[in-house]
């Protein structure tokens, strides 16, 4: 079943973590966050690093000392720091070594669903992306520093999740600097193959609200809708029996009034992970729209018992009341799963004791 090159075993570095005081994040954000959103943000942030390196995060057991402690706090002042990390975890032949403590400053305004949460304090900096903040601090816990500064300009030489600069944009993908640094410290993940979906055969609209239509365009799908409408778009990927590391999505928001808010992944009908994508074109993206090529890591890396169902939550809504078209268009180019090169007999590595 597995090709010969797929019989190279990834040596995963199991990193235990604990999370405390999530209620602080909920209570400080004026209704914008809830416990589910905080969980989604944390799982998304942890899974980002596993896309590039063989690191695997798991909750610490009841009597286990976690390697990474994450705590949501109030620091007494906003915008002074978004988070801080002390200590880090190294990869060693005997397993991960070290410890790190992360604090997330909830006195700042934070968001998960960028375009559905109110800007509570328009006269102060923010709001800030909770997924990016968590991913940044986890990067420090893995031993990664900020990008170096160019002496000539005083600016960082590269951008990335690990950038020290703070903005209120959505950033939920590793950039080249992040990938190089995590692979230098924790190794490079070995991928077996990428298995794509037959979009034309498996694409389905679920629970459309309002005027929404789905059309086949060659091997791709085109989803369009009137303003105020929404739908779930389901696609099946033939992944049965494979260990899935990440989901790959490629789509173009042809018009600015389209928002892909969440992506939910199922093993058949069993939920695997929900990811907050918050993908939307911006004012400066031009008349051709904006293309997104996303690589969404899965925290638990399931061995699929069935085909993987990938569900996109799509809204057709104007951005900030802009005088845009009365309909929006999304073109879906590709949905695929990235599988790991593990034969059946070593897949048990994904079930730590």
Where are the language model's segments positioned?
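Glycan-recognition and processing domains
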Residues: 188-228, 336, 340-352
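Exposed low-complexity, polar/acidic, P/S/T/G-rich flexible segments that act as propeptides
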Residues: 311-353
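Short, surface-exposed beta-strand/strand-loop-strand elements in extracellular ectodomains
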Residues: 257-270
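Short beta-strands within extracellular/lumenal beta-sheet-rich domains
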Residues: 220-242
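Extracellular Ig-like/FN3 beta-sandwich strand-entry sites
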Residues: 305-309
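A short beta-strand element within beta-rich, extracytoplasmic domains
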Residues: 242-254
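Extracellular carbohydrate recognition and processing domains
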Residues: 272-301
């Amino acid at each position: 079943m597995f090709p010969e090159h797929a019989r190279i075993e990834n040596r995963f570095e199991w990193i235990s973590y604990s999370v405390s005081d999530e209620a602080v994040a909920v209570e400080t954000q004026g209704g914008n966050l809830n416990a589910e959103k905080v969980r989604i943000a944390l799982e998304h942030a942890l899974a980002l690093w596993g896309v590039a390196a063989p690191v695997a995060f798991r909750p610490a057991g009841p009597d286990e000392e976690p390697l990474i402690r994450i705590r949501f706090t109030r620091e007494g002042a906003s915008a002074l720091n978004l988070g801080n990390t002390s200590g880090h975890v190294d990869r060693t032949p005997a397993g991960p070594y070290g410890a790190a403590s992360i604090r997330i400053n909830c006195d700042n305004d934070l968001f998960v669903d960028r375009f559905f949460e109110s800007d509570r304090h328009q006269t102060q900096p923010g709001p800030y992306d909770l997924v990016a903040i968590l991913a940044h601090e986890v990067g420090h816990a893995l031993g990664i520093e900020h990008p170096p500064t160019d002496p000539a300009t005083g600016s960082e030489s590269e951008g990335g999740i690990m950038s020290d600069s703070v903005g209120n944009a959505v950033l939920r993908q590793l950039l080249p600097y992040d990938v190089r640094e995590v692979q230098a410290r924790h190794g490079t993940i070995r991928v077996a193959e990428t298995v794509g979906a037959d979009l034309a055969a498996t694409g389905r609209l679920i629970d459309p609200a309002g005027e929404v239509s789905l059309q086949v365009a060659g091997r791709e799908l085109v989803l369009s809708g009137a303003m105020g409408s929404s739908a779930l778009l389901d696609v099946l990927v033939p992944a049965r029996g494979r260990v899935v590391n990440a989901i790959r999505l490629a789509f173009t928001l042809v018009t600015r009034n389209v928002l892909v808010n969440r992506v939910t992944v199922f093993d058949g009908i069993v939920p695997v992970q929900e990811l907050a994508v918050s993908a939307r074109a911006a004012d400066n993206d031009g008349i051709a729209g904006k293309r997104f090529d996303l690589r969404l890591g899965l925290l638990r890396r399931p061995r699929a018992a069935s085909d993987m169902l990938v569900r996109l939550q799509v809204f057709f809504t104007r951005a900030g009341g802009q005088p845009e078209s009365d309909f929006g268009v999304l073109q879906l180019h590709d949905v695929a799963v990235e599988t790991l090169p593990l034969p059946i007999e070593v897949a048990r590595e994904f079930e730590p004791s």
